[in-house]
């Protein structure tokens, strides 16, 4: 085997020669679903004729040589990165999986076995025998270079990609932005990575699907009119950046909006999958006519779309949406899917409406599901390596990517993802945000093992580990958070740029504007004194211990009934230890890791005045929405990420006032914040007020 020289353009000729020597092509068996992979279903390959088996063995050996050549190229060009280990984070992550409220009873052996079965290495490449047998009569492919499917993945030369790759590593790539005001309440921001002084214009606003090439099957299935499917106002805002393959971070206003944006991204995902498959099948025909033609149209593995959602209920809604829009009428294992993902149940009506929405239906958060499309049917529970779309929960895919048994770890099926969608990120953050970070650590990596792929047709930007420059990442959340921004700014390198919206909160839309309770609310700012974001927790803790704790000890208001609300669990541990070791304050605590006995006991002790202060975490409030009795004053260690939580917690005072247990003129609400709490603060007090609180001369502001 000749030595392969590393470099931005090297490897193509050698890989083509290695892979396609002899021009042998192998037909593969049908896909193996979770149910089909049981021991009772033995492969027919064991009974194959000796001559056929020998030919397959020769081809497999030949593929192994090709893959070794590929790895030689990749390792010389892209040394393996070493990730810093964080034992504390891993320990907390494991504890969160085992003990968090949303995970009760989900770690079943059956579900783990289903996932392991779906990872079994079975025959079948980017297209398999079933795809090859499909008729090409309805391949309506666009050759128009203005079609984003064409332009996005083919726009950049290898030398230009190499320059961007080097620029990102050297931190010489600069993002240039343009801002468009949609209304008084919302603006759109588009940023594009640049190597030079090119001008960045706003996203072209066509606001209609008719401007984009949609597969004929999807047009017929979705009753497209001459001007395209009628779009809602939200869909008009989203359609252009989405179908132009730009990264997106969208903060929606109402839970009813979810159905609208899912309509759009389901169509986008289907359109991408159908176009990808038909392009490959069409090129297969071209190669039969001219086998020397170079057609680069594939990745390492088949899956092209990854959808991450918090619960099975959300997954069920999305799969049903995909089925509805797919143009197919055959759905394999549909009844099994309904049994495992659908549940007709609602939370108690006494809980807030947002709680009822998030925790309706099947709230199990442990699953990974493969969807495979043929021209006639949708196969649910398909093997992951033969799937076109993978739908998962962060916890479910974490089991695969970071399995405690290193031999069972796999991430090759994520190597060729081109569209990644994270839905309901605000809910996912309360499960375990670290699992989302893990996905980004494993996506678009070079496969560790040989897979069924024709290396002569793999795009060079896959081989050069540059797929991250083309992957579209779409994030939907009810509330934009620093973590959401870190995904868009830190984990996404799409050369098409990134698009986000920003909602301006009017005073009457803010938490204090909708509170309906005339209680004294004091916002106290602490300065970082030149510190960075990494130093912020230390400055906050120092301010709390030096300013807030003395006010608790020498309170001029109520000496008991003080609810201390702490959003972050690590802050909670730090504060709890300080109060225990450094003060004489009698306090209780309830958090997401407390068992039911502790929750009941500590709430009762607080209610009856046996403890002066009760520590309460935001994650516990998200999952339980407790109405805590005997609350006379509230201290927010940090503004809540969800503005509804501010109102819900403060209203505990109002209920206590109604019962005659305290005087609203004596009760107080204190919230400590810094300039870095701008996103949360904006939703609590309103956009204009938040600007004053963050940058004003005063350090204390009061509302009533």
From Swiss-Prot:
GO CC term, one of those recorded: small-subunit processome
Keywords: Nucleus, Ribonucleoprotein, Ribosome biogenesis, rRNA processing
Subunit structure: Component of the ribosomal small subunit (SSU) processome composed of at least 40 protein subunits and snoRNA U3.
Similarity section: Belongs to the UTP25 family.
Organism of this sequence: Kluyveromyces lactis (strain ATCC 8585 / CBS 2359 / DSM 70799 / NBRC 1267 / NRRL Y-1140 / WM37)
Segments for region (Disordered): 1-152
This protein's name: U3 small nucleolar RNA-associated protein 25
Gene Ontology biological process terms, A to Z: maturation of SSU-rRNA from tricistronic rRNA transcript (SSU-rRNA, 5.8S rRNA, LSU-rRNA)
Biased composition, class Acidic residues, residue ranges: 99-113, 127-148
Cell location: Nucleus, Nucleolus
A GO molecular-function descriptor: rRNA binding
Basic and acidic residues bias: start-end ranges: 54-63
Functional note: DEAD-box RNA helicase-like protein required for pre-18S rRNA processing, specifically at sites A0, A1, and A2.
Origin superkingdom: Eukaryota
Gene3D superfamilies assigned: P-loop containing nucleotide triphosphate hydrolases
Intrachain disulfide bonds: none
InterPro entries: P-loop_NTPase (IPR027417), UTP25 (IPR010678), UTP25_C (IPR053939), UTP25_NTPase-like (IPR053940)
